[in-house]
Amino acid sequence: IEEDLIEEVIRVIGFDKLPLSAPLAPVSARVRPEAQRGSHALRRAVAALDYQETINFSFVEERWEAELAGNLEPIRLLNPIAAPLSVMRSSLLGSLVQVLRHNLARRATRVRVFELGRVFRRDASVQTSEQTVVGIDQPLKVAGLAWGPVEPLQWGARERAVDFFDVKADVEALLAPRVATFVAAEHPAMHPGRCARVELDGRTVGFVGELHPRWKQGYELPAGQGAPVLFELDVPALLARPVPAYQPVARQQAVNRDIALIVGEAAGHDAVIGSLLAADTGGLLRSARLFDVYRPAPGAAGFQPGER
């Protein structure tokens, strides 16, 4: 490496011949843009949501890649440090599931962990540079796993297991003040009916969902307790944040109104709220929030023609 070559040259010339005064050079401070936060700030934000950071090997078991990442052609190591750790990871989720298993073997009753690191995927468009290798994409990801009670042991509330919506709220907090859209989706590691794709400005930035029942059983997790909930997000999407812009306070007092809509069962939350916000209200509508859902009782006749 460069430093070793410099050391050898100095040894030949003689250390006693080096000038005693430090070299002078102009120094210019590098100021991070206000609309960008660093990875350490992101780590602190995840830790503030009650997750503990873990650091795992970048080489993992081939089984994890096939089952939890759907990657049947992972990048193989020519000289792995151990026979099971034979491929490079393309997802952080396998390592977090293994961390959960490690803690459960030591009788942990509540586990909330995360990792921020690089994953490795084949990409023919990547060229060799100072930080890249030809054909290999190395994006930064952050992933988290929550299992067990929502709150630590305490007396003020009944114990409740963490669920999809708890972790979804954590993802929303990490992306705030930007508002994400959650679209029902499928992921190799996650429950097909309890998984969502996270989108920002129409672009997919990650996934959140419960661990698939098949993998919960396959990785020997407790059967009588809830499934762990996981998320994995692109780090660049989390580092960007809009700069607050001043808006004058309205001279007129805000008015709240309730509105009832009749929609089909297939209509989701985002479709309902999106249609309201897209309506031509002349700038009078600032926000909309869904607070109640009513469904007729099973067997009821429903709405009559004159009741709509």
Question: Where do the language-model regions lie?
Answer:
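Extended, well-folded interaction surfaces typified by the phenylalanyl-tRNA synthetase beta subunit core
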Residues: 1-111, 116
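Residues forming anionic-ligand binding surfaces in small-molecule and nucleic-acid pockets
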Residues: 12-28, 73-78, 119-158, 248-258, ...
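Glycine-centered flexibility sites
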Residues: 14, 50, 117, 148, ...
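Generic alpha-helical structural element
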Residues: 31, 35, 85, 89, ...
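A general structural signal for short secondary-structure junctions and capping/turn motifs
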Residues: 44, 48, 84-85, 103-107, ...
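A carboxyl-terminal module marker
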Residues: 56, 63, 137-138, 143, ...
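Active-site loop ensemble at the mouth of alpha/beta enzyme cores that anchors a bound cofactor
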Residues: 69-81, 85, 133, 206-217, ...
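Short beta-turn/strand-loop junction motif enriched in small, turn-promoting residues
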Residues: 101-103, 121-122, 213, 295
